[in-house]
């Protein structure tokens, strides 16, 4: 069921997804109280005879749609002309009211065979918990409705971005990636205490940890993928890593071929900004056949390591050569442990610029450059 945007006319057309909802048309958003009482503005009255939906089932959940079905007693079932669907984010479950400020999450649809598809990126966000309740209604000749009592409240959670959605993000990121610059090392900044802890408690090997919630809210890697964060940006005038960092004054550097080579796969993970002009692209490097590789293969678009707009590894005269995109900041996640002995740790001479940290950074949902037309 496609639901009209708030600024659409009250008599909105049916969804173009006709194979799903060809018999469904949408009415004006109604104003009624959650407890089923008649509202002064709504023209809705109670009627005991209409069946109350029960045994509600939610299925086919995506980041911005779901299917809903329920059972009803046969009594007065043939009098049902409409369904009222009350959809709320879970944190608002105790204030389920038909109010102007909640529109358009209060949905009115003509009665059609179930299950019914509810779709709308302007009110459904990915990876978000919602509550839903249903009411049956019968539209009268004078335009008023008689309604059943509300059903029980059901909870569900929307899904992450699919590969299709991530491919849309990927294509938007490609537009602004810019020309490619040569680089030779990946690096990771941390505090001295971090590297001391790695040496003492992890046998000198940096261990993957769960990615934080920075970036797109719908990214399937946030809070799930385990990896180690690296950078590869270089200064334009020197071709070397910058001396400043927001993450710590000690830097681990490792030759690029140690992490990125023909025995690894490269994946696109996310594209976002933080209310600034800077845009970030998250890439994942995973050794072929590793658990991280299997995780990414199921969820992320895979990139051609030799030919893409962000990070490449090519062979020239028998030597591996590396390039990164100039106009986006790359955040590279490596999914396996990395031993400190294969690189070097040294103190940087620049500043620790905490304001540039992306730890748990929230994506700007209004940016037209890095958002797509699904839940943010």
From Swiss-Prot:
UniProt-listed InterPro entries = FN3_dom (IPR003961), FN3_sf (IPR036116), Ig-like_fold (IPR013783), PHYHIP/PHYHIPL (IPR042868), PHYIP/PHIPL_C (IPR045545)
Q: What are the residue boundaries of the Fibronectin type-III domain, all occurrences included?
A: 52-161
Q: Which UniProt keywords apply?
A: Glycoprotein, Phosphoprotein
Which residues get modified to Phosphoserine? 12, 15, 25
**Got a GO cellular component term for this one?**
cytoplasm
- Cite the PROSITE patterns for this sequence: FN3
**CDD domains, alphabetically?**
FN3
- Using the UniProt annotation, give the residues that carry a glycan (glycosylation sites): 23, 37
Indicate yes or no for the key word Glycoprotein. Answer: yes
Tell me which Pfam families the record gives. fn3 (PF00041), PHYHIP_C (PF19281)
Gene3D superfamilies listed in its UniProt record: Immunoglobulins (2.60.40.10)
Q: Which domain of life is it from?
A: Eukaryota
Outline what the protein does.
May play a role in the development of the central system.
Q: Which family does it belong to?
A: Belongs to the PHYHIP family.
Stated name of the protein: Phytanoyl-CoA hydroxylase-interacting protein-like
Q: Which organism is it from?
A: Homo sapiens (Human)
Cite the source lineage: Eukaryota, Metazoa, Chordata, Craniata, Vertebrata
Gene this chain is encoded by: PHYHIPL
């Amino acid at each position: 069921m496609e639901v009209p945007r708030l600024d659409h006319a009250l008599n909105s057309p049916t969804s173009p997804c006709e194979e799903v909802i060809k018999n469904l048309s949408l009415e004006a958003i109604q104003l009624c109280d959650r407890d089923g009482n008649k509202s002064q503005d709504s023209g809705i009255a109670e009627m005991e005879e209409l069946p109350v939906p029960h045994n509600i089932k939610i299925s086919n959940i995506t980041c911005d749609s779901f299917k809903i079905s329920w059972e009803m007693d046969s009594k007065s079932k043939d009098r049902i002309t409409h369904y009222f669907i009350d959809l709320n984010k879970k944190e608002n479950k105790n204030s389920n009211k038909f109010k102007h400020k909640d529109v358009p999450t209060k949905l009115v649809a003509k009665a059609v065979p179930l299950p019914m598809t509810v779709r709308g990126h302007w009110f459904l966000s990915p990876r978000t918990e919602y509550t839903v309740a249903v009411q049956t209604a019968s539209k009268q000749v004078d335009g008023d409705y008689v309604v059943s009592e509300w059903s029980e409240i059901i909870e569900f959670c929307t899904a992450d971005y699919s590969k299709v959605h991530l491919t849309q993000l990927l294509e938007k990121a490609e537009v602004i990636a810019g020309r490619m610059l040569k680089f030779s090392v990946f690096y990771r900044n941390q505090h001295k205490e971090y590297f001391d802890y790695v040496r003492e408690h992890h046998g000198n090997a940096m261990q993957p940890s769960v990615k934080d919630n920075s970036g797109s809210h719908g990214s399937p890697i946030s809070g799930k993928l385990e990896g180690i964060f690296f950078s590869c940006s270089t200064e334009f005038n020197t071709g070397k890593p910058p001396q400043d960092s927001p993450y710590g004054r000690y830097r681990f550097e490792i030759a690029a071929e140690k992490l990125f080579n023909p025995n690894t796969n490269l994946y696109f993970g996310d594209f976002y900004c933080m209310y600034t002009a800077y845009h970030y692209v998250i890439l994942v490097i995973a050794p072929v056949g590793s658990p991280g590789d299997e995780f990414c293969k199921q969820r992320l678009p895979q990139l051609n390591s030799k030919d893409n707009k962000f990070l490449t590894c090519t062979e020239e005269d028998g030597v591996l050569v590396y390039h990164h995109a100039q106009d986006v900041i790359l955040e590279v996640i490596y999914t396996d442990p990395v031993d400190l002995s294969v690189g070097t740790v040294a103190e940087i001479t620049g500043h620790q610029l905490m304001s540039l940290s992306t730890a748990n950074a929230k994506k700007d949902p209004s940016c037209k450059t890095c958002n797509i037309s699904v839940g943010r």
